[in-house]
C-alpha cells in the first residue's frame, strides 16, 4: 500500500490521519510492513478552485497517479516500492488565476530511494518526519 498525502491539507491534517495510520500499521505489521508513506509539500486534496491555489499549491492528483503507476509496476513486474519520503515541490508563484505553467522542477518524482534528508522513518509506532 502507498499512502499519498499533501502536507498542507488543512481539512484532513496529516498529523490526525495519515501519520497516525502509518504509525499504527507499523505496530501491527512491524518489519513485514509493505506500507509506504509519501508526503507532498505544497499540496492538498481540496480547494483547487480557491483563489491563489494555482500560485501556492501543486496538484496532488499527479502524485496519486504516480503512486498508482509504481504500485502497478510492483504488482506486475516485482519492482520495489519506493521508500517512505517527503517529496519537496516548488509552488509556481505568479498572479492568482494566472500562474505560470507547471514545470518538472515544480513537481519532482517520487524516488525509489529517498535522500536522507527526505526519508520518513517508521519504527515501533513512531513516525519520524523530516522538516
Residue ranges of predicted features:
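C-terminal His-loop and adjacent cap/lid subdomain of alpha/beta-hydrolase
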Residues: 1-131
Amino acid at each position: 500500500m502507498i499512502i499519498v498525502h499533501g502536507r498542507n491539507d488543512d481539512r484532513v491534517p496529516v498529523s490526525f490521519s495519515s501519520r497516525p495510520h502509518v504509525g499504527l500499521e507499523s505496530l501491527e505489521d512491524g518489519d513485514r510492513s509493505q506500507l509506504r508513506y509519501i508526503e507532498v509539500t505544497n499540496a492538498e486534496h481540496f480547494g483547487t478552485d480557491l483563489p491563489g491555489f494555482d500560485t501556492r499549491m501543486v496538484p496532488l492528483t499527479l502524485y496519486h497517479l504516480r503512486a498508482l503507476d509504481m504500485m502497478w509496476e510492483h504488482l506486475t513486474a516485482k519492482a520495489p516500492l519506493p521508500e517512505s519520503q517527503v517529496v519537496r515541490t516548488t509552488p509556481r508563484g505568479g498572479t492568482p488565476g494566472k500562474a505560470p505553467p507547471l514545470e518538472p522542477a515544480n513537481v519532482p518524482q517520487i524516488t525509489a530511494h529517498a535522500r536522507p534528508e527526505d526519508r520518513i522513518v517508521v519504527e515501533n509506532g513512531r513516525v519520524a518526519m523530516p522538516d
